[in-house]
Amino acid sequence: MIKKIGVLTSGGDAPGMNAAIRGVVRAALTEGLEVFGIYDGYLGLYEDRMVQLDRYSVSDMINRGGTFLGSARFPEFREEHIRAVAIENMKKRGLDALVVIGGDGSYMGAMRLTEMGFPCIGLPGTIDNDIKGTDYTIGFFTALSTVVEAIDRLRDTSSSHQRISVVEVMGRYCGDLTLAAAIAGGCEFIMVPEVEYTRDDLVAEIKAGIAKGKKHAIVAITEHMCDVDELASYIEKETGRETRATVLGHIQRGGSPVPYDRILASRMGAYAIELLLQGHGGRCVGIQNEKLVHHDIIDAIENMKRPFKNDWLDCAKKLY
């Protein structure tokens, strides 16, 4: 019988994490459970930095970016003796289960704790949208809004100077954020890690656009694919058009979450409590076709396939 739970955020922050914490806390309190917030992710769990939360602890949090509980990278959590200390800390507080909000690295920690006998539920919190078992992750749509706003501003100046702009978008090794931003921002060219593409392919497409009368262009590219400053220099050399690179960086992680992320985070947080009360552990929450679902965490980490959004890419190319 679950009476007390913990909640933490781990890994890179994402807009909507506070809304997810709020969803967990208020749904748990409605069911008569006690809730403890853990500061700075798994590091705080290991260092026994926890605080009991009530309804007012999460007041005015639904619209705030970041995570008020904090987050930290803690690779040492891979070690079993480190996790054993974390479990002992939770047991000292009387905790029966844990809700973890984060990406696939956070999921791995939750899975390991479950394997050691401490039930966990994972919620997908990352702007990269790279978690298997869910159509969208908490924070994706807010980051998308931020990227599109930046692209709109770059288009203003690119068109004024008949310039080519190369925009580096976050996503780690997933092109979803780049693809969505390219469609919404009307980008002329796209480079994502799921599609094999050379810089000469890109230059050929840009030259074809120039031959048709294109005066300026926006190139959206996912991070880690290449050095965007070098790419911009190469494009300028090969096309004769002034080209500049812009790395949006961590600004993409900040900002007040858009309504969809607030709703998604709230629903997922409340659903995590439902699952725990039903006796589930080692599960992760997702949304598929606008319905909440849950999967075994190990499947989300290792076994499930995450289909590439070819229809998004096809749409973007038709609109070049």
Swiss-Prot record:
Residues reported in the UniProt entry to bind Mg(2+): 104
CDD domains with a match to the protein in the record: Bacterial_PFK
Subunit structure: Homotetramer.
Record-given protein name: ATP-dependent 6-phosphofructokinase
Function: Catalyzes the phosphorylation of D-fructose 6-phosphate to fructose 1,6-bisphosphate by ATP, the first committing step of glycolysis.
Residues the record lists as binding substrate: 126-128, 163, 170-172, 223, 244, 250-253
Activity: how regulated: Allosterically activated by ADP and other diphosphonucleosides, and allosterically inhibited by phosphoenolpyruvate.
Organism placement in taxonomy: Bacteria, Pseudomonadati, Pseudomonadota, Gammaproteobacteria, Enterobacterales
UniProt-listed GO biological process terms: canonical glycolysis; fructose 1,6-bisphosphate metabolic process; fructose 6-phosphate metabolic process
Organism superkingdom: Bacteria
Cofactor(s) needed for function: Mg(2+)
Gene: pfkA
EC number: 2.7.1.11
Gene3D superfamilies, A to Z: 3.40.50.450, Phosphofructokinase domain (3.40.50.460)
Keyword presence, Kinase: yes
Stated family: Belongs to the phosphofructokinase type A (PFKA) family. ATP-dependent PFK group I subfamily. Prokaryotic clade 'B1' sub-subfamily.
Binding of ADP, residues: 22-26, 55-60, 155, 186-188, 212, 214-216
Keywords per UniProt: Allosteric enzyme, ATP-binding, Cytoplasm, Glycolysis, Kinase, Magnesium, Metal-binding, Nucleotide-binding, Transferase
PANTHER family in alphabetical order: ATP-DEPENDENT 6-PHOSPHOFRUCTOKINASE (PTHR13697:SF4), PHOSPHOFRUCTOKINASE (PTHR13697)
Keyword Ion transport: no
Species assigned in the record: Klebsiella pneumoniae subsp. pneumoniae (strain ATCC 700721 / MGH 78578)
A single GO molecular function term of this UniProt record: ATP binding
Pathway participation: Carbohydrate degradation; glycolysis; D-glyceraldehyde 3-phosphate and glycerone phosphate from D-glucose: step 3/4
